């Protein structure tokens, strides 16, 4: 299954208990996939989704959080549409649901951005809004030069609101228009991982990061094949291995590592091909080669000790056979 499908499936099965979060997720899904129709003078709400599990989740939340019944229609593949599509439709009391979810304002006019209770809500509401937006119209590409997490939005106002929600989650996202379609894009690999973690797609993050690391190792191996100097090959391979160990060390220690050691480790992660001397120059304030090496060494030692105490894999467990070749 492609990464987009993996993430959507995991998010659609995620258990969310807080009513405000469920409300924010439903409101965003309806805003990004829904259509308001007047049928016989009454408002009917339709939301088209690409998986059955997402449709069942939406229908369940509409009933449990808002108290409205809905029906699910299955649209068979046709034209460019390869798979089934699932339409969740609310016919009875559609106007009431539209007001509850913020799709229309007090005067009955459609809301163009995200509903007020989502925009003005807490961090958990921002997370839920992004989760709903991704379930509705999100995509995740494979790790590589053009990797991205992207959401197609119903308009520029909704796109800007989603960028604002990402900012509250401390994730950098950009709104852009491509061929008349508004999109919000997260491109940086670390930002993509952070966003997926925020949304609750923990298994998907692990799978995506594994593919990302494999690609980096392969790319490094390809560069190494062109190196004439054996010392340069060993140094580059050691840098990649050190980066993998540092990543694992930061996961083990979480918030318990001293800030100056964390800073040294993050420098190594950000500049995996840099020499120790170059890393020292990038530090603030600049450090000597021995000083930066010592900090990284202490970070790894502290993490390995913590791993031994907890009985979990240490930093060397993150190394792959490609990294161990002399």
Swiss-Prot record:
Domain of life (superkingdom): Bacteria
UniProt-listed GO biological process terms: cell division; regulation of sporulation
Family: Belongs to the WhiA family.
One MF annotation (Gene Ontology) recorded for this entry: DNA binding
Any Pfam family the entry gives: WhiA_N
Keywords in alphabetical order: Cell cycle, Cell division, DNA-binding
Function: Involved in cell division and chromosome segregation.
Source lineage: Bacteria, Bacillati, Actinomycetota, Actinomycetes, Streptosporangiales
Entry-linked InterPro entries: Homing_endonucl, Sporu_reg_WhiA_N_dom, Sporulation_regulator_WhiA, Sporulation_regulator_WhiA_C, WhiA_LAGLIDADG_dom
Binding region for DNA: 275-308
Source organism of the structure: Thermobifida fusca (strain YX)
Name this protein carries in UniProt: Probable cell division protein WhiA
């Amino acid at each position: 299954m492609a990464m987009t499908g993996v993430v959507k499936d995991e998010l659609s099965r995620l258990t969310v208990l807080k009513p405000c979060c469920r409300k924010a997720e439903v409101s965003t899904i309806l805003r990004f996939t829904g259509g308001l129709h007047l049928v016989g003078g009454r408002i009917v709400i339709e939301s088209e989704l690409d998986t059955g599990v997402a449709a069942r989740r939406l229908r369940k939340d509409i009933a449990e959080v808002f108290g409205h019944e809905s029906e699910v229609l299955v649209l068979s593949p046709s034209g460019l549409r390869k798979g089934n599509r699932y339409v969740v439709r609310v016919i009875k009391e559609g106007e009431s649901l539209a007001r509850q979810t913020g799709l229309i304002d007090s005067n009955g006019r459609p809301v163009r951005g995200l509903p007020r209770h989502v925009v003005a809500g807490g961090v958990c509401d921002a997370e839920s809004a992004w989760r709903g937006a991704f379930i509705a119209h999100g995509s995740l590409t494979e790790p590589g030069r053009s990797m991205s997490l992207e959401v197609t939005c119903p308009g520029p106002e909704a796109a800007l609101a989603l960028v604002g929600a990402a900012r509250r989650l401390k994730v950098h996202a950009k709104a852009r228009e491509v061929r008349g379609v508004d999109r919000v894009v997260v491109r940086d690999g670390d930002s993509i991982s952070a966003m997926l973690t925020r949304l609750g797609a923990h298994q998907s993050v692990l799978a995506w990061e594994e593919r990302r690391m494999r690609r980096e190792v392969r790319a490094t191996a390809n560069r190494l094949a062109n190196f004439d100097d054996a010392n340069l090959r060993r140094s580059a391979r050691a840098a990649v291995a050190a980066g993998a160990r540092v990543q694992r060390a930061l996961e083990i220690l979480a918030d318990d590592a001293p800030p100056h050691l964390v800073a040294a480790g993050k420098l190594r992660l950000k500049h995996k091909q840099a020499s120790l001397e170059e890393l020292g120059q990038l530090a603030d304030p600049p450090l000597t080669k021995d000083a930066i090496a010592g900090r990284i060494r202490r970070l790894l030692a502290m993490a390995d000790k913590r791993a031994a105490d907890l009985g979990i894999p240490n930093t060397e467990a993150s190394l792959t056979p490609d990294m161990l070749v002399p």
